[in-house]
């Protein structure tokens, strides 16, 4: 519910100071409540805030961030987060992966999971996806009607085709399609491949990724190229970037550029930067723009494929002042971190390993930028970094990478207090 609203609710769970209730009917509506743009919103679990005015969505997320820092991190004295308003609230996602299922009478369902369920909501258009992805999805739907392939997303059953992943180049218009199955189905996919090549979706590659294991990982270790190539190109911070089919790359390119440029601005205003350490460097989207500014950069990435693509991306852009190390950050960082380094941390949602935080507070690099996609783990990690009073938070910047959802990206800049 939004401020000022009145509603009829059903109490589902109650404690002394807490009640969890389900909404039955809104009696008095807030002017901040809007009509969802998506016709599937009431069922689909992909978005959770389409009923809220977009700018107020960001205000809610900012409050959740502040609450996490105060309640989880037990932080009392930190600067007010700066809000960077997103450039677009819809059609921003450059990648999506859809579970697939054949109904008993042969119809193929492609979509997203229903809220709090493993049932697939059949969608034909998603307003947060890049238009090119929606176009490719529409083409795939039509082709699958005439070319039946056994499909079942449920890892407990035999399956066949499990997921369809579509990635688009926002600035290059390239499209890459990956069919994920629990065994090779490339022979079954060839008729589909031929028709997709003849469509207007600008497809540069069609792949079959094989994921035979009964777990929740979408992609497996083996990918077969059916046609074209297994990557796309895009422009990122004026650099040419190669992105693999299973590579991690921020789904909102425009907002990711804003975050990188914010880090560049912080670095440009500091003195005597000897080198930059980019922990969790991925395919080099942070390291390469920073190296192009003339800094010496070391990128650390444990994923083999991402590491190899990062090297290729540096070569494509003729960057000579960068070194990529295919290493575990927790084991490798203690060997190279120096007090005058500028350390950039961009970990997965689970945050930093406690042993890595111990290394940081022991070796004490003078500057730290921590980019986080999870306010809860960010708050936890900051409390551990700050507990010995060796660092001060200089700035907190919030980016809305994921409009229409509760997710938030946060950049925290810390500076060492002691020499």
UniProtKB/Swiss-Prot annotation:
The active site is at residue 373. The keyword 4Fe-4S applies. GO terms for molecular function: 4 iron, 4 sulfur cluster binding; metal ion binding; rRNA (uridine-C5-)-methyltransferase activity. The keyword Chaperone does not apply. Transmembrane segments: none annotated. InterPro entries: MeTrfase_TrmA_AS (IPR030390), MeTrfase_TrmA_CS (IPR030391), NA-bd_OB-fold (IPR012340), SAM-dependent_MTases_sf (IPR029063), U5_MeTrfase_fam (IPR010280). Pfam families: tRNA_U5-meth_tr. It is an enzyme of class 2 (transferase). Its EC number is 2.1.1.-. S-adenosyl-L-methionine binds at residues 250, 280, 301, 346. One of its GO terms (biological process) is rRNA base methylation. Coiled coil: none annotated. Keywords: 4Fe-4S, Iron, Iron-sulfur, Metal-binding, Methyltransferase, S-adenosyl-L-methionine, Transferase. PANTHER family: RNA M5U METHYLTRANSFERASE, TRNA (URACIL(54)-C(5))-METHYLTRANSFERASE. Belongs to the class I-like SAM-binding methyltransferase superfamily. RNA M5U methyltransferase family. NCBIfam families: rumA. This is Uncharacterized RNA methyltransferase Pro_0965. It comes from Prochlorococcus marinus (strain SARG / CCMP1375 / SS120). The lineage of its organism: Bacteria, Bacillati, Cyanobacteriota, Cyanophyceae, Synechococcales.
């Amino acid at each position: 519910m939004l401020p000022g609203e009145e509603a009829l609710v059903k109490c589902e769970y109650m404690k002394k100071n807490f009640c969890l209730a389900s909404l039955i009917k809104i009696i008095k509506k807030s002017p901040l409540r809007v009509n969802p743009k998506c016709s599937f919103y009431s069922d689909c679990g992909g978005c959770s805030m389409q009923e809220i005015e977009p700018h107020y969505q960001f205000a809610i997320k900012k409050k959740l961030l502040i609450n996490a820092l105060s309640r989880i991190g037990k932080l009392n004295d930190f600067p007010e987060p700066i809000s960077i308003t997103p450039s677009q609230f819809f059609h921003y996602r450059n990648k999506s992966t859809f579970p697939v299922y054949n109904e008993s009478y042969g119809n193929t369902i492609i979509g997203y999971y229903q809220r709090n369920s493993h049932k697939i909501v059949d969608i034909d258009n998603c307003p947060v996806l890049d238009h090119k992805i929606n176009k490719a999805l529409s083409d795939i739907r039509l082709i699958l009607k005439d070319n039946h392939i056994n499909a079942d997303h449920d890892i407990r059953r035999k399956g066949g085709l499990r997921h369809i992943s579509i990635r688009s180049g926002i600035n290059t218009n390239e499209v890459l399609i990956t069919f994920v199955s629990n065994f090779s189905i490339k022979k079954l996919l060839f008729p589909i491949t031929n028709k997709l090549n003849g469509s207007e979706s600008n497809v540069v590659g069609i792949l079959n990724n094989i994921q035979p294991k009964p777990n929740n990982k979408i992609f497996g270790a083996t990918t077969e190229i059916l046609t074209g190539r297994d990557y796309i190109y895009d422009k990122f911070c004026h650099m040419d970037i190669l992105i693999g089919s299973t590579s991690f790359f921020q789904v909102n390119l425009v907002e990711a550029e804003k975050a990188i440029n914010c880090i560049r601005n912080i670095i440009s205003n500091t003195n005597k930067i000897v080198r930059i350490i980019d922990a969790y460097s991925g395919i080099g989207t942070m390291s390469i723009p920073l190296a192009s500014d003339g800094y010496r950069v070391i990128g650390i990435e444990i994923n083999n494929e991402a590491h190899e693509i990062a090297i290729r991306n540096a070569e494509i852009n003729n960057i000579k002042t960068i070194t990529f190390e295919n290493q575990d950050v927790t084991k490798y960082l203690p060997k190279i971190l120096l007090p005058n380094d500028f350390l950039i941390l961009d970990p997965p949602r689970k945050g930093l390993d406690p042993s890595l935080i111990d290394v940081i507070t022991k070796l004490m690099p003078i500057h730290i930028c921590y980019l986080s996609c999870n306010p809860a783990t960010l708050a936890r990690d900051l409390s551990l970094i700050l507990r010995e009073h060796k660092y001060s938070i200089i700035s907190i910047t919030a980016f809305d990478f994921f409009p229409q959802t509760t997710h938030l990206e946060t950049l925290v800049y810390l500076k060492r207090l002691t020499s």
